[in-house]
Amino acid sequence: MARNVVYPLYRLGGPQLRVFRTNFFIQLVRPGVAQPEDTVQFRIPMEMTRVDLRNYLEGIYNVPVAAVRTRVQHGSNKRRDHRNVRIKKPDYKVAYVQLAHGQTFTFPDLFPEKDESPEGSAADDLYSMLEEERQQRQSSDPRRGGVPSWFGL
Protein backbone atom coordinates (compact mmCIF):
# COMPACT_ATOMS: atom_id res chain seq x y z
CA MET A 1 0.00 0.00 0.00
CA ALA A 2 2.82 2.42 0.78
CA ARG A 3 5.84 3.09 -1.37
CA ASN A 4 8.94 1.01 -0.87
CA VAL A 5 11.08 3.44 1.08
CA VAL A 6 13.91 2.62 3.46
CA TYR A 7 13.37 4.49 6.70
CA PRO A 8 16.08 5.10 9.30
CA LEU A 9 15.94 2.85 12.34
CA TYR A 10 13.76 4.13 15.14
CA ARG A 11 15.58 4.74 18.38
CA LEU A 12 13.76 5.24 21.64
CA GLY A 13 13.19 8.95 22.22
CA GLY A 14 14.02 9.88 18.63
CA PRO A 15 11.49 11.49 16.30
CA GLN A 16 9.48 9.40 13.90
CA LEU A 17 10.49 10.64 10.47
CA ARG A 18 7.77 8.91 8.47
CA VAL A 19 4.88 10.37 6.53
CA PHE A 20 2.26 7.90 5.35
CA ARG A 21 1.40 8.27 1.66
CA THR A 22 -0.53 5.76 -0.38
CA ASN A 23 -0.18 4.70 -3.99
CA PHE A 24 -3.96 4.74 -4.34
CA PHE A 25 -5.97 7.54 -5.87
CA ILE A 26 -9.71 7.52 -5.32
CA GLN A 27 -12.27 9.64 -7.16
CA LEU A 28 -15.51 10.87 -5.70
CA VAL A 29 -18.15 10.31 -8.40
CA ARG A 30 -21.62 11.77 -8.80
CA PRO A 31 -23.99 8.75 -8.82
CA GLY A 32 -25.96 8.11 -12.01
CA VAL A 33 -29.09 7.09 -10.12
CA ALA A 34 -30.43 8.53 -6.88
CA GLN A 35 -28.89 7.01 -3.75
CA PRO A 36 -29.55 7.48 -0.04
CA GLU A 37 -27.96 10.53 1.58
CA ASP A 38 -25.62 8.38 3.67
CA THR A 39 -24.12 6.59 0.62
CA VAL A 40 -21.13 7.95 -1.30
CA GLN A 41 -19.82 6.53 -4.58
CA PHE A 42 -16.09 6.31 -5.36
CA ARG A 43 -14.06 5.07 -8.31
CA ILE A 44 -11.05 3.19 -6.95
CA PRO A 45 -8.15 1.15 -8.42
CA MET A 46 -8.64 -2.56 -9.07
CA GLU A 47 -5.98 -3.48 -6.50
CA MET A 48 -7.68 -1.63 -3.65
CA THR A 49 -9.83 -3.72 -1.30
CA ARG A 50 -12.76 -2.77 0.94
CA VAL A 51 -10.53 -2.85 3.99
CA ASP A 52 -7.99 -0.57 2.28
CA LEU A 53 -10.74 1.91 1.40
CA ARG A 54 -12.17 1.87 4.92
CA ASN A 55 -8.72 2.47 6.44
CA TYR A 56 -8.01 5.18 3.83
CA LEU A 57 -11.17 7.14 4.63
CA GLU A 58 -11.02 6.68 8.41
CA GLY A 59 -7.26 7.18 8.77
CA ILE A 60 -6.60 10.07 6.39
CA TYR A 61 -9.92 11.93 6.21
CA ASN A 62 -11.45 10.97 9.59
CA VAL A 63 -14.69 9.88 7.91
CA PRO A 64 -16.67 7.31 9.95
CA VAL A 65 -17.61 4.38 7.70
CA ALA A 66 -20.38 1.87 8.42
CA ALA A 67 -20.08 -0.41 5.37
CA VAL A 68 -18.23 -0.66 2.05
CA ARG A 69 -19.60 -2.46 -1.01
CA THR A 70 -17.61 -2.83 -4.24
CA ARG A 71 -18.22 -3.98 -7.79
CA VAL A 72 -16.07 -4.21 -10.91
CA GLN A 73 -17.17 -2.11 -13.88
CA HIS A 74 -15.96 -3.52 -17.19
CA GLY A 75 -14.60 -0.98 -19.66
CA SER A 76 -16.39 -0.51 -22.97
CA ASN A 77 -15.14 -2.40 -26.00
CA LYS A 78 -16.90 -0.47 -28.76
CA ARG A 79 -14.23 1.92 -30.06
CA ARG A 80 -12.11 0.88 -33.03
CA ASP A 81 -8.82 2.24 -34.31
CA HIS A 82 -7.71 2.95 -37.89
CA ARG A 83 -7.14 -0.78 -38.51
CA ASN A 84 -10.68 -1.62 -37.32
CA VAL A 85 -9.29 -3.32 -34.21
CA ARG A 86 -11.35 -2.96 -31.06
CA ILE A 87 -9.93 -0.72 -28.33
CA LYS A 88 -10.97 -1.69 -24.80
CA LYS A 89 -11.11 0.88 -22.05
CA PRO A 90 -9.60 -0.34 -18.78
CA ASP A 91 -11.80 -1.88 -16.08
CA TYR A 92 -12.26 -0.04 -12.81
CA LYS A 93 -13.76 -0.73 -9.43
CA VAL A 94 -16.73 1.19 -8.03
CA ALA A 95 -17.12 1.42 -4.25
CA TYR A 96 -20.29 2.39 -2.42
CA VAL A 97 -19.43 3.67 1.06
CA GLN A 98 -22.21 3.85 3.63
CA LEU A 99 -21.40 6.49 6.22
CA ALA A 100 -21.86 5.93 9.94
CA HIS A 101 -25.17 6.69 11.66
CA GLY A 102 -26.16 10.35 11.41
CA GLN A 103 -23.62 11.24 8.69
CA THR A 104 -24.94 12.52 5.34
CA PHE A 105 -23.30 13.67 2.12
CA THR A 106 -24.77 15.66 -0.74
CA PHE A 107 -22.76 16.11 -3.90
CA PRO A 108 -21.91 19.80 -4.40
CA ASP A 109 -23.48 21.70 -7.29
CA LEU A 110 -20.31 22.66 -9.16
CA PHE A 111 -22.04 24.24 -12.16
CA PRO A 112 -25.16 26.10 -11.01
CA GLU A 113 -27.64 27.40 -13.55
CA LYS A 114 -27.13 31.08 -14.35
CA ASP A 115 -29.96 33.49 -13.58
CA GLU A 116 -31.40 35.84 -16.19
CA SER A 117 -29.33 38.97 -16.24
CA PRO A 118 -29.87 42.36 -17.88
CA GLU A 119 -27.37 41.33 -20.56
CA GLY A 120 -29.72 38.52 -21.52
CA SER A 121 -32.53 41.03 -22.16
CA ALA A 122 -30.23 43.04 -24.48
CA ALA A 123 -29.54 39.86 -26.42
CA ASP A 124 -33.28 39.22 -26.64
CA ASP A 125 -33.84 42.76 -27.97
CA LEU A 126 -31.16 42.25 -30.62
CA TYR A 127 -32.65 38.89 -31.58
CA SER A 128 -36.16 40.36 -31.94
CA MET A 129 -34.81 43.25 -34.05
CA LEU A 130 -33.01 40.84 -36.40
CA GLU A 131 -36.13 38.68 -36.60
CA GLU A 132 -38.24 41.72 -37.63
CA GLU A 133 -35.73 42.62 -40.36
CA ARG A 134 -35.81 39.05 -41.68
CA GLN A 135 -39.63 39.08 -41.75
CA GLN A 136 -39.59 42.41 -43.59
CA ARG A 137 -37.16 41.07 -46.23
CA GLN A 138 -39.25 37.94 -46.75
CA SER A 139 -42.58 39.74 -47.06
CA SER A 140 -43.71 40.33 -50.65
CA ASP A 141 -43.59 43.74 -52.26
CA PRO A 142 -47.14 45.18 -52.41
CA ARG A 143 -46.32 46.97 -55.69
CA ARG A 144 -45.80 43.66 -57.53
CA GLY A 145 -49.47 42.69 -57.19
CA GLY A 146 -48.92 39.08 -56.08
CA VAL A 147 -46.34 38.27 -58.78
CA PRO A 148 -43.53 36.16 -57.23
CA SER A 149 -40.08 37.69 -56.92
CA TRP A 150 -38.45 35.04 -59.12
CA PHE A 151 -40.56 36.28 -62.04
CA GLY A 152 -38.44 39.34 -62.68
CA LEU A 153 -38.97 42.04 -65.25
Curated annotation (Swiss-Prot):
Compositional bias (Basic and acidic residues): 131-144
A GO molecular-function annotation: RNA binding
InterPro entries named among the record's database cross-references: Nucleotide-bd_a/b_plait_sf (IPR012677), Ribosomal_uL23-like (IPR013025), Ribosomal_uL23/eL15/eS24_sf (IPR012678)
Residues that span the membrane, as ranges: none
Localization terms from the record: Mitochondrion
GO biological process entries: mitochondrial translation; translation
Pfam (any one): Ribosomal_L23
GO cellular component: fibrillar center; mitochondrial inner membrane; mitochondrial large ribosomal subunit; mitochondrion
Domain of life where this protein originates: Eukaryota
SUPFAM superfamilies for the chain: Ribosomal proteins S24e, L23 and L15e
Keyword field: Mitochondrion, Ribonucleoprotein, Ribosomal protein
Keyword rRNA-binding: no
Record family assignment: Belongs to the universal ribosomal protein uL23 family.
Oligomer status and interactors: Component of the mitochondrial large ribosomal subunit (mt-LSU). Mature mammalian 55S mitochondrial ribosomes consist of a small (28S) and a large (39S) subunit. The 28S small subunit contains a 12S ribosomal RNA (12S mt-rRNA) and 30 different proteins. The 39S large subunit contains a 16S rRNA (16S mt-rRNA), a copy of mitochondrial valine transfer RNA (mt-tRNA(Val)), which plays an integral structural role, and 52 different proteins.
Name this polypeptide is given: Large ribosomal subunit protein uL23m
Natural source organism: Homo sapiens (Human)
Lineage of origin: Eukaryota, Metazoa, Chordata, Craniata, Vertebrata
